[in-house]
Design a protein with these regions (language model features):
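Substrate-binding pocket helix/loop in short-chain dehydrogenase/reductase
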Residues: 71, 99-112, 221
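Active-site helix of classical SDR
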Residues: 123, 159
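Residue(s) in the substrate-gating loop at a strand-loop-helix junction
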Residues: 143
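Alpha-helical segment proximal to the catalytic Tyr-Lys
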Residues: 128, 172-173, 249
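Short, small/polar-rich loop/turn modules that mediate ligand/substrate recognition or access, typified
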Residues: 175, 180, 251-253
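Conserved glycine-rich cofactor-binding loop
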Residues: 16-17, 40
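Short C-terminal tail/terminal secondary-structure segment
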Residues: 18, 148, 240-241, 252-267
Length: 267
């Protein structure tokens, strides 16, 4: 299937590593010109080079989107390198450890800054250009914790819950403009960091020393699903790329859970 993304211009925040990197690679593989964002240019340049080596088009962009000035820098660099963006993937966010009694007021504010305002700044900077063109895609990266939050990390789940409601509000704001807004919500993702963390835990618990040995225990004791494997970053990226494409014009104001069936709910 041709996703009709050739020549589309996409900015992916936090695409210097992890799932964001895979989203940038996948968009470029479909012909999009990708802005790879990092808080430090060197990290973004490494991913941009990787895209170039695979025959794709990419440019490294820098900006501390946790500040207004840093977000303005990223928006300026995006405009200079790409022109008006067609696609924005608000991928950046962090899940810092905490609990109801250990997470203090600054932790809650920090979670909102990282997971909500970072996206708001860039969204507000790009949405008018999309409206003017009559076409655009804004995709926010959420979490299944917005649907079924855990007791741990309440500050993080509260912030991601705000991103979920923000997505619907923005979709209504952009009604009939040709710009769609959706939320893609993964559960546990098999990133390099997740593999390393659970392999280390598995060695202590006697589960084994490889991911193949440890994964069944992760699914049983930490976060199970109906597929029998922990979703890979590539699987999240594939969904994001489809939603970003012209083929997905009827998908709007939706929370798409990509968790292998961890949250097996009718909603």
């Amino acid at each position: 299937m041709d996703l009709q993304l050739a020549g589309k211009k996409a900015l992916v925040t936090g695409s210097y590593r992890g799932t964001g990197r895979m989203i940038a690679l996948a968009l470029a593989a479909e012909g999009a010109h990708v802005g790879v964002h990092g808080f430090e240019r060197e990290a973004a340049e490494a991913v941009a080079r990787e895209i170039h080596e695979q025959g794709g088009a990419a440019v490294a962009l820098e900006g501390d989107i946790l500040t207004d000035d840093g977000a303005k820098q990223l928006l300026r660099e995006t405009q200079d390198a790409l022109g008006d963006a067609d696609i924005l993937v608000n991928n950046y966010g962090t899940a810092d450890a905490g609990s109801w009694m250990k997470s203090e007021t600054p932790d809650w504010i920090d979670a909102y800054q990282k997971n909500v305002l970072s996206a708001v700044r860039i969204t507000r900077g790009l949405m008018e250009g999309m409206k003017a063109k009559g076409w655009g895609r804004i995709i926010n990266l959420g979490t299944i914790g917005s649907t079924e939050p855990a007791a741990r990390m309440p500050h993080y789940y509260a912030a991601k819950g705000a991103m979920a409601t923000m997505t619907i509000s923005l979709a209504k704001e952009l009604e009939s403009t040709g710009v769609t807004v959706n939320l893609v919500s993964p559960g546990l993702i098999r990133t390099k960091e997740v593999e390393e963390r659970f392999i280390a835990r598995g060695k202590k618990k006697g589960w084994g020393e490889t991911w193949e040995e440890v994964e069944p225990h992760v699914l049983k004791e930490f976060m199970g699903n109906l597929t029998g494997h922990v979703p890979r970053p590539e699987e999240i990226a594939d969904v994001v790329v489809f939603v970003a494409s012209p083929r997905a014009g009827a998908i709007n104001a939706l929370n798409i859970r990509v968790d292998g069936g961890t949250t097996a709910l009718v909603t």
